[in-house]
């Protein structure tokens, strides 16, 4: 997928109150005020990302991660990996089964293929997961039983430093897999982090708090907090020694109980009491900060967590697919609020046990400010469900808006079997017109008086001449009249309107707004939808729909359904 680079722009987020569970009147209008020159805040483009397995011809992504449980036991020398509890502790060639042919029989094929995919998809930021578990799959295929646990012939020991000469062809007959040789090999093939093709960052493995469960053939007992720090410091130091410009992500916490206590790590209670930590994230940040003080090098650039909503719908199930149940759909839309809204209490086991660290983002930032200032935040896996329904698109759009508002640096959605609506929502931020135009990098001030919608506003660079506004509607059945006032010295003339709604993943181009008076717009927003309004300060001829569709095919590929149909309401 080849598209134009995302132009520098300015983005604004305003969440219009708490998303109520009650129904809304049909004439419940929303009044939105946008102040393009006020309260600017930078936004990272890398929040618009995906994990491997997503067809990059279907989404204009800005970041890409190669991760997941299999990467913990990935042997770069022969491309074998072990699935752990995900699939019968099977060792096989799964990670390169769909790789480009040229990478299936060479060392590091999974990593090289990830770089190749990202380059073909015009994705500027790539993150590679490194192995910290301790052992990786050997050359022996098949199910690994309990009596074949490491150390055994079914595994190769991972050693960070070879302390010897690197080889362009790793020795597959010894009993070790060397991480420094792996990094050197990748740099020789695709370059360092400052090159176009090199990995920009490395993750310190994947979900270590679950190793004793997901990879019980290697890690038989729950990991101690102190063990994780020791492993993390050693591997992070190696990364910085090898490629000083690369960013380090860690510790890839799988969910709430990992944030809290590293999922009940054996030494957590003692460490918490001795240091008055609130949760494991405090300890991890503090220890990595101490490691920087000792080494003179920052060893953790980005705090890496995973988040899958635990909120239950009216049916009592987590992230259900009961789209004909209004209560279940509303629960999905509301669940995003656990990231930021102190007045929201989701229906989940987390709330039942106190939900001490909700809302999540303010609590994370508090820990960063106290224990390791300037650490960035990443959600390298997340999903709010509904990938096959418009509610999933609305939840995804709100998630991206919240990531923008709270300064998240990097985010890559982990897609399930169905992801079309979620990817379409991402395209509303990165490629709404099929020609590569999207949102950018700074918040501005907005205000709204209606609980039923969320509003995200943007300008290009520092130029108030074009204002872009995304509105998400949480009303399941009725249109919402929205009155928009732009408080700016610029005089606005016309606007384009794009929308994602109903039973289609197409981004539709609706009727243009041809005349704007007194910097005010009134528009009816479709129920359960994502709408983008692109407002121009001077009269610009509308691009013919045929030309836009042709540009979409060139920019995103013929396989992408970004149908810009000019329609009425």
Model-derived features with residue positions:
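N-terminal substrate-binding region of glycoside hydrolase catalytic domains
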Residues: 31-181, 203, 208-224
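Mobile, glycine-rich extracellular loop/lid and propeptide segments
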Residues: 117-120, 127-137, 166-190, 198-231, ...
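Noncatalytic carbohydrate-binding groove/subsite architecture in carbohydrate-active enzymes
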Residues: 177-190, 217, 225-391, 396
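Glycan-recognition and catalytic regions of carbohydrate-active enzymes
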Residues: 389, 400-468, 494, 503-506
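Carbohydrate-binding surface patches
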Residues: 450-491, 527-534
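C-terminal beta-strand-rich structural cap/linker in extracellular carbohydrate-active enzymes
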Residues: 514-540
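Short, hydrophobic alpha-helical membrane anchors of single-pass surface/secreted proteins
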Residues: 541-551
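C-terminal membrane-anchoring or membrane-association module
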Residues: 556-569
């Amino acid at each position: 997928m080849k598209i134009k680079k995302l132009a520098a722009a300015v983005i604004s987020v305003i969440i219009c109150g708490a998303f109520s569970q009650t129904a809304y009147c049909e004439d419940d209008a929303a009044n939105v005020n946008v102040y393009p020159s006020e309260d600017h805040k930078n936004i990272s483009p890398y929040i618009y990302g995906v994990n491997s397995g997503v067809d990059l011809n279907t989404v204009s992504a800005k970041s890409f991660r190669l991760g997941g449980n299999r990467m913990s036991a990935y042997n770069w020398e022969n491309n074998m990996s072990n699935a752990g509890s995900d699939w019968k502790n099977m060792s096989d060639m799964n990670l390169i089964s769909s790789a480009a042919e040229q990478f299936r029989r060479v060392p590091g094929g999974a990593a090289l293929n990830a770089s190749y995919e990202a380059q073909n998809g015009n994705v500027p930021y790539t993150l590679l997961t490194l192995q910290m578990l301790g052992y990786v799959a050997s050359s022996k295929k098949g199910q690994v039983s309990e009596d074949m646990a490491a150390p055994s012939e079914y595994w190769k020991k991972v050693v960070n430093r070879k302390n010897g000469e690197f080889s362009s062809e790793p020795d597959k007959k010894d009993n070790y897999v060397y991480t420094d040789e792996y990094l050197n090999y990748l740099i020789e093939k695709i370059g360092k982090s400052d090159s176009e093709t090199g990995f920009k960052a490395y993750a310190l493995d994947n979900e270590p708090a679950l190793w004793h469960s997901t990879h019980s053939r290697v890690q038989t007992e729950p990991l101690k907090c102190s063990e994780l720090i020791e492993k993390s410091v050693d591997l992070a130091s190696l990364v910085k020694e090898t490629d000083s410009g690369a960013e380090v992500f860690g510790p890839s916490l799988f969910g709430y109980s990992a944030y809290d206590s590293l999922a009940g790590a054996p030494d957590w209670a003692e460490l918490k009491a001795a240091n008055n930590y609130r949760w494991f994230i405090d300890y991890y940040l503090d220890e990595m900060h101490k490691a920087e003080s000792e080494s003179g090098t920052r060893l953790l650039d980005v705090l890496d967590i995973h988040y899958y909503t635990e909120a239950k719908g009216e049916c009592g199930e987590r992230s259900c697919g009961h789209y004909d149940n209004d209560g279940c759909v509303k629960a999905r839309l509301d669940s995003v609020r656990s990231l930021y809204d102190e007045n929201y209490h989701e229906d989940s086991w987390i709330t039942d046990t106190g939900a001490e660290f909700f809302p999540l983002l303010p609590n994370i930032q508090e820990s960063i400010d106290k224990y390791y200032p300037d650490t960035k935040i990443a959600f390298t896996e997340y999903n709010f469900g509904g990938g096959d329904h418009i509610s999933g698109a609305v939840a995804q759009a709100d998630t991206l808006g919240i990531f923008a508002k709270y300064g998240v640096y990097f985010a890559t959605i982990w897609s399930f079997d169905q992801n079309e609506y979620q990817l379409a929502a991402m395209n509303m931020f990165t490629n709404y017109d099929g020609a590569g135009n999207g949102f950018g990098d700074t918040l501005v001030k907005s205000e709204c008086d209606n609980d039923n919608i969320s509003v995200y506003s943007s300008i290009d660079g520092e130029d108030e001449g074009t204002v872009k506004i995304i509105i998400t509607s949480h009303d399941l059945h009725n249109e919402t009249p929205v009155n928009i006032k732009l408080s700016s010295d610029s005089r606005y003339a016309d606007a384009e309107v794009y929308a994602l709604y109903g039973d289609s993943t197409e981004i539709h181009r609706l009727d243009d707004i041809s005349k704007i008076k007194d910097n005010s717009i009134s528009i009816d927003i479709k129920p359960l939808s994502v709408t983008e309004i692109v407002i121009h300060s001077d009269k610009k001829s509308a691009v013919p729909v045929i030309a836009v569709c042709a540009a979409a095919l060139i920019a995103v590929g013929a396989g992408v359904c970004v149908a810009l149909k000019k329609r009425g309401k």
